[in-house]
Design a protein with these regions (language model features):
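A bilobed periplasmic-binding-protein/Venus flytrap-type ligand-binding module shared by bacterial periplasmic
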Residues: 93, 202-205, 263-287, 291, ...
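Surface-exposed binding/hinge segments that line
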Residues: 80, 84, 126-168
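Ligand-site clamp/hinge motif
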Residues: 204-250
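Aromatic- and charge-enriched surface segment that lines or borders ligand/interaction sites
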Residues: 77-122, 138, 144, 278
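Short, low-complexity disordered leader/linker segments with a strong preference
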Residues: 1-33, 70-73, 133-134, 330
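Append "and occasionally in soluble cytosolic enzymes with long acidic Gly/Pro-rich linkers
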Residues: 280-339
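N-terminal lobe/hinge region of extracytoplasmic solute-binding protein
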Residues: 37-81, 114, 183
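Gly/Pro-rich hinge or "lid" segments in bacterial periplasmic/extracellular proteins
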Residues: 66, 159-211, 216, 331-335
Length: 339
């Protein structure tokens, strides 16, 4: 099943909740600060393995996603695709600076993607770029990628955070201290990191798309989902990503706003094909699949905040609804077992 989240805030299908009262009180003091209930981070290394909300605040990709989850410009203001040569050419924004003041160029892009592709670096993102056969820097603000085959998801993959070559060249891409003191091109800069307690970001006045409205964002480390809901209620948090059950508590409360949003979070019951049992009894697998009421699980566990999945990919613009799948059909399951 694909999980839908909700974000709720004090004044998400997982819900994000916003607490308007807390933020307004801080804004009245002159500096606007948002306190977000976050899971913990051991490092901030989007190119190798980390997935977190903090990445898109500190870093930028060549592309981004808009409010409808469609591909939009990022560090690349535009791009072209040559169907004959399977080549994407990206035209980069000019006058973009890293948080340390150094200029961003196409060399940073080439460095980042090649670092991800390098098997010695052990990046879990490497499979996204296995079709790339050549990366050519045309000039400081133009770069091309040639593929071995068409890849409909390539522009999505280019949302990958770009890293600064001048700070990471020659560094260990897994162990470098950079990933505890990251420098990006994003709308926020790292201000402080109190391990296990909070990560504080301040707005980047030189952000190439314009300085953000909120002056400071505090990622308060609250790993427990229940604790996030409690701290939303007490006003200790302004924003949190909550489970559907917890988000429902805030949906109708004055002073709170909940935002439903789709995620790529995936949950499934998988077969262990290393076990000889499934090799010997593979004929019963369809029967098991037909016997599982996925929608009932979504309704009971996620309060309906999710959708049935046919595989690990999102049912979005790339989805093929005609792919073979097993809808809930207990009678068909019984027929297979009795055959």
């Amino acid at each position: 099943m694909m999980l839908s989240m909700a974000a709720c805030g004090n004044g998400a299908e997982e819900k994000e909740t916003e607490n308007s009262a807390g933020t307004e009180a801080q804004a009245a003091g002159g500096e606007s600060t948002l306190v977000y209930g976050s899971n913990d981070y051991t490092r901030i290394n989007p190119a190798m393995d980390e997935h977190g909300e903090i990445n898109i605040l500190i870093f930028s990709g060549l592309t981004s996603h808009d409010g409808e989850n469609q591909v939009a410009p990022g560090l690349a203001k535009s791009w072209d695709y040559d169907e004959d040569t399977l080549t994407y050419t990206f035209h980069l924004e000019e006058n973009v600076k890293w948080h340390d003041g150094e200029p961003f160029t196409a060399d940073d892009v080439k460095f980042t993607i090649e670092a991800i592709m390098d098997p010695d670096n052990g990046s879990e993102n490497a499979p996204n770029y296995e079709d790339v056969t050549a990366i050519d820097v045309i000039d400081d603000h133009t770069i091309s990628f040639t593929l071995s085959a068409p890849n409909v998801a390539f522009l999505d993959y280019m949302t990958m955070a770009i890293l600064p070559k001048h700070l990471l060249e020659g560094e260990d891409m897994q162990e470098s201290d950079f990933f505890r003191h990251p420098i990006g091109t994003g709308p926020y800069k790292l201000d402080s990191w109190d391990a296990g307690q909070a990560i504080t970001l301040v707005k980047n006045e030189d952000y190439f798309k314009g300085a953000p409205n909120i002056d400071k964002i505090i990622f308060k480390i609250v790993p427990d989902d229940n604790a996030k809901a409690i701290q939303m209620q007490s006003g200790e948090l302004d924003l949190a990503l909550l489970t559907p059950k917890d988000a429902k508590t805030f949906a109708d409360q004055d002073g709170y706003t909940c935002y439903d949003m789709k995620t790529s979070d995936y949950r499934g019951i998988l077969y262990n094909f290393n076990n000889d049992y499934w090799t010997a009894n593979k004929d019963i697998i369809p029967a098991i699949n037909y016997a599982i009421d996925r929608q009932a699980i979504i309704d009971a566990v996620l309060l309906g905040q999710g959708m049935t999945a046919y595989g690990p990919l999102q049912r979005n613009i790339y989805n093929n609804e005609n792919v073979e799948h097993y809808d809930y059909d207990p009678e068909k399951s019984k027929e297979i077992l009795e055959a």
